[in-house]
A protein has these predicted regions:
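C-terminal membrane-associated helical module and adjoining short loops/tails
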Residues: 1-23, 40-53, 128-129, 133-213
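Membrane-embedded alpha-helical segments that form the functional core of polytopic membrane enzymes
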Residues: 14-16, 21-72, 88-96, 102-115, ...
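Core segments of transmembrane alpha-helices
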Residues: 18-26, 80-92, 118-123, 145-157
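Residue-level signature of transmembrane alpha-helix interfaces in integral membrane proteins
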Residues: 29, 35, 72-75, 93, ...
Length: 213
């Protein structure tokens, strides 16, 4: 690999991995920034979250544009996505409960479970498929899920934490619609992957074959 190509590779991997410290900045500000959150800290947390969301698009775009797609990137990108979900959803549940939106907090718990359950279910199906020589490329539902998830999480945070005198407000119906859409796309994605890997799942459900005599 040439020096120029190596630096392009490092640049793309850096875009992926920088998501983790950005998420930690968001977490630290949300937990320890005080309540109500000062405007400066709100801007810092929101900016960190928006940058983390943007890197999810930038890393894939630049990897293809610079022709430095790699196996490391194919594993690191979903890993950092999971880190994003694992950090942001519990934080949003905490923030919703803190401002007295207990019903909203309960729904966010359900939404978090759906996101994490979908990831675990797809990983399980892929592992099962590998035993039977069956694989499936990423489909539209996975891409749609990611495309919807990041704006939804950012919108929820803005809705919960934006200062009272902030000029721009996100209406509750918009936030609610995004949350329902996110829940729906997770269920759809689980169904699509289940259908793709059904032959492997069906073979395993039949139980072990009798040993040859």
């Amino acid at each position: 690999m040439s020096v120029s190509r190596r630096w392009k590779f490092y640049f793309v991997q850096g875009l992926t991995l920088v998501r983790v410290p950005l998420i930690l900045v968001f977490l630290a500000v949300s937990l320890f920034g005080g309540y109500p959150l000062p405007k400066a800290w709100f801007v810092v947390a929101l900016g960190a979250m928006l940058l983390a969301a943007a890197t999810d698009w930038w890393d894939g775009y630049f990897a293809r544009r610079l022709e430095v797609t790699s196996r490391l990137g194919s594993y690191a990108d979903p890993m950092t996505d999971k880190a994003f979900y694992l950090t942001t959803f519990p934080t949003l549940v905490y923030l919703a409960a803190r401002v007295g939106q207990h019903g909203h907090a309960r729904f966010l718990v359900v939404l978090a479970i759906l996101f994490l359950l979908r990831d675990q279910w797809v990983s399980f199906l892929r592992s099962l498929g590998a035993l039977h020589g069956l694989s499936a490329a990423a489909n539209w539902s996975g891409k749609a899920r990611t495309l919807i998830a990041f704006p939804t999480i950012c919108a929820i945070y803005y809705y919960l934490q934006a200062p009272a005198d902030w000029p721009l407000r996100i209406p509750w119906p918009v936030v609610c619609s995004l949350e329902v859409l996110s829940a729906g796309i997770n269920l759809v994605s689980m169904g699509i992957y289940s259908r793709q890997f059904w032959p492997a799942l069906r073979a395993e459900l039949r139980g072990p074959t009798d040993p040859a005599r």
